[in-house]
Amino acid sequence: MDEAYYSGNLESVLGYVSDMHTELASISQLVIAKIETIDNDILNKDIVNFIMCRSNLDNPFISFLDTVYTIIDQENYQTELINSLDDNEIIDCIVNKFMSFYKDNLENIVDAIITLKYIMNNPDFKTTYAEVLGSRIADIDIKQVIRKNILQLSNDIRERYL
């Protein structure tokens, strides 16, 4: 898929967009169907593992995050932005992103998770902040926010990126 996106071949790009559109719609429906069966502790652990680049794609919300990450990664702006920050700015970014977890806005929560994933690609930050991330996210219950906002967020992502 990535080669098609970057090749400039219009047919390949249109196929990629169609595939990602379908995947995002499908996984959003699966999240709605399965979210109640996922224990909150397991959901939070899987979110932390996703951030730390160890994804459990059997969890539909993690599959949703992975799909969104793939779509957004094509824009490639996030990596460049993170790489342009110094350590203090990254620490400020981590603190600010954590605030998103305490708001009832799924778009902000997903943005925070994906930004933290980009930051944790740096082994130094992963080593330093892995434990803090795990303990902070363990206290959060986002199932209600997911259930309430997943379809709207999915539509917004498709409109914005595809």
Curated annotation (Swiss-Prot):
Protein name according to UniProt: Protein A49
Gene Ontology cellular-component annotations: host cell cytoplasm; host cell nucleus
Pfam family, any one: Orthopox_A49R
Protein origin, superkingdom: Viruses
Record GO biological process: symbiont-mediated suppression of host NF-kappaB cascade
Disulfide bonds: none
Family according to the record: Belongs to the poxviridae A49 protein family.
